Amino acid sequence: MRGILRMTVLAAAVFGVAGNALAEDWKLAKDEDGVKVYLSSVQGSKYKAYRGVTDIKADVATIEALQEDVKGSCKWIHACAEMKLLKQEGADAWTYSKIDMPWPVTGRDVVIHVTTEKTADGTVIRHLKADPTYIPEEKGQIRVPKLVGEWKLQPKGQGVTEVTYQVETEPGGSIPSWLANSFVVDAPLNTLKGLRSAAEKR
């Protein structure tokens, strides 16, 4: 079920920037345990975009397999409460995730349309875009209205893969500034650490 892999990215992606804007002027915000996190302001949004980059000592196929494990992937995606595949058609998939928020902030959920492509050098790129009206909203959750991003798995040789995880989003509703500011760092940092740990144990 290789297509299920396309859903792996979404649960950690709840804060960032406007879905139709482009982030630029990336600045290093954190460099910890082999993971670099960059942030960028986005015109028209009060939320920052984030980009995380790390090297994983595993090949692309190993990382793909981890992402295809829908239930298992929720264990290493930051703030993931639930994740499931809604539909798959070839290179396109629609996924649903719930994201944990600290009390008293209302939890978020998000439907993501993921399109996967592979390049000639073996790089896998997963393009992410929110599709908030794909299914009815759930009671007790705030649906994320805008999100764009991507996963990029690029082979570097000798069994090493460079993984980039980038997201821009509008989380909907009201988010305290302290939470928004911490989430844009914690989401890529913890997600990439978790993925790396799982991949390198295989």
From Swiss-Prot:
Record-level Gene Ontology MF annotations: lipid binding
Top-rank lineage group of the source organism: Bacteria
Domain START: 1-202
GO CC annotation: cytoplasm
Family matches, as Pfam families: START (PF01852)
CDD domains xrefs: START_1
Function, in words: May play a role in the interaction of the bacterium with animal cells.
Protein name: Uncharacterized protein PA1579
Organism, as annotated: Pseudomonas aeruginosa (strain ATCC 15692 / DSM 22644 / CIP 104116 / JCM 14847 / LMG 12228 / 1C / PRS 101 / PAO1)
Organism ancestry: Bacteria, Pseudomonadati, Pseudomonadota, Gammaproteobacteria, Pseudomonadales
